[in-house]
């Protein structure tokens, strides 16, 4: 079978070693004669899977002991509701930074529960899309929390600063597309959430990291399945969790630890992004319209100078084993998502193809 590199934005490529282990264990896990998908989530065998996954996740991110880790349903969109329902308390407003599509989606959901103070951080610098630095964000005086999305997968825009607003500001962040891809100081945040389907594992699982002093504040109308306190008190098993996704994510955590952890991922991700952006910037045939300071390392959108060639590019790249390069319908063009599981070899293969395609069609 020919090598295929999957550049999908999510569900995304998983480490080949993890897939092979899951394949090997699929029908007979731990000698039980059954699949891990079939065993009880309350049995001692799966409890061990769950505990090891949380421990490895904590180790990878050096999560402080005063933070709880929840394994949840609902994805990022579920947390768009979960954040206000758990954190508003007796306040009626919260600060929301809008830097792109997913941040705006969080704002839309927040309007159901509060009056969001929307901080429009989108700017244009020398004709390129960019984001205002955090020092220019105008926070309100009585906000229950601040919400932002550091990496916009559709727009290819990233906020590389980590928040430093002081202890009075409860910072919440959607890290679905960047978690485990580089250094992260968890102590700067009140709540971090991430859908698993990009850098953690398969779709269906969402991880929430919540500072323990923020528990116990959920609105009385908050569904129990979104209530952080209920989930924490029940060890993320208030109802049957997505056990197979939890198991696979645990395998990914072990793969990460075996391969140098977050520090090594950070190094490789930087190499991949630099290679791809340098190929785009060194050509008049391809272009990226994001300012260099705000370019995403995970999601690289680019356009061809002649959009009439888009269909040909996608057909030829797919035939070459380079899959899922079509850009999101909102922005068009192409997009290469290069999360942790994408090896440097995959980006090398893509850039070689891009150079050759330009030679033949430019």
UniProtKB/Swiss-Prot annotation:
User: Which GO biological process annotations does it have?
Assistant: L-serine biosynthetic process; pyridoxine biosynthetic process
Q: What Pfam families does the record tag this protein with?
A: Aminotran_5
Query: According to its UniProt record, in which pathway does this protein act?
Result: Amino-acid biosynthesis; L-serine biosynthesis; L-serine from 3-phospho-D-glycerate: step 2/3; Cofactor biosynthesis; pyridoxine 5'-phosphate biosynthesis; pyridoxine 5'-phosphate from D-erythrose 4-phosphate: step 3/5
Identify the residues that bind pyridoxal 5'-phosphate.
76-77, 102, 153, 174, 197, 239-240
Per UniProt, L-glutamate binds at 9, 42
Quote one Gene Ontology molecular function term: pyridoxal phosphate binding
> What is the documented function of this protein?
Catalyzes the reversible conversion of 3-phosphohydroxypyruvate to phosphoserine and of 3-hydroxy-2-oxo-4-phosphonooxybutanoate to phosphohydroxythreonine.
Q: What is this protein called?
A: Phosphoserine aminotransferase
Species of provenance? Enterobacter sp. (strain 638)
């Amino acid at each position: 079978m020919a090598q295929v590199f999957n550049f999908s934005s999510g569900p995304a490529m998983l480490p080949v070693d993890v897939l092979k282990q899951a394949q090997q264990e699929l029908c007979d896990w731990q000698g039980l004669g059954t699949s891990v998908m079939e065993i009880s989530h309350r049995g001692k065998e799966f409890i061990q899977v769950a505990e090891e996954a949380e421990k490895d996740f904590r180790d990878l991110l050096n999560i402080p002991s005063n933070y709880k880790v929840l394994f949840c349903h609902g994805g990022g969109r579920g947390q768009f509701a979960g954040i206000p329902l758990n954190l508003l308390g007796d306040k009626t407003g919260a600060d929301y930074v809008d830097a792109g599509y997913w941040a705006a989606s969080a704002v839309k959901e927040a309007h159901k529960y509060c009056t969001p103070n929307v901080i429009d951080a989108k700017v244009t610098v020398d004709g390129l899309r960019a984001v205002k630095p955090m020092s220019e964000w105008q926070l309100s005086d009585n906000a229950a929390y601040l919400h932002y999305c550091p990496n916009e997968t559709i727009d290819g825009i990233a906020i590389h600063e980590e928040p430093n607003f002081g202890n009075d500001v409860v910072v919440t962040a959607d890290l679905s597309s960047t978690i485990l891809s580089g250094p992260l100081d968890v102590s700067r945040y009140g709540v971090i959430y991430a859908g698993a389907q990009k850098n953690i594992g398969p779709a269906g699982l969402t991880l929430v990291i919540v500072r323990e002093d923020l528990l116990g504040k959920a609105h009385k109308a908050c569904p129990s399945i979104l209530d952080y306190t209920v989930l924490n008190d029940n060890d993320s098993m208030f109802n049957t969790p997505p056990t197979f996704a939890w198991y696979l994510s645990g395998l990914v955590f072990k793969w990460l630890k075996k391969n140098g952890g977050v520090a090594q991922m950070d190094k490789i991700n930087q190499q991949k992004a630099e290679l791809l952006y340098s190929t785009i910037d060194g050509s008049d045939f391809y272009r990226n319209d994001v300012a260099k300071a705000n370019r995403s390392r995970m999601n690289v959108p680019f356009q061809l100078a002649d959009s009439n060639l888009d269909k040909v590019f996608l057909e030829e790249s797919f035939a070459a084993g380079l899959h899922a390069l079509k850009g999101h319908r909102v922005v068009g063009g192409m997009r290469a998502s290069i999360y942790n599981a994408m090896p440097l070899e995959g980006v090398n293969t893509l850039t070689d193809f891009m150079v050759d395609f330009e030679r033949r069609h430019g």
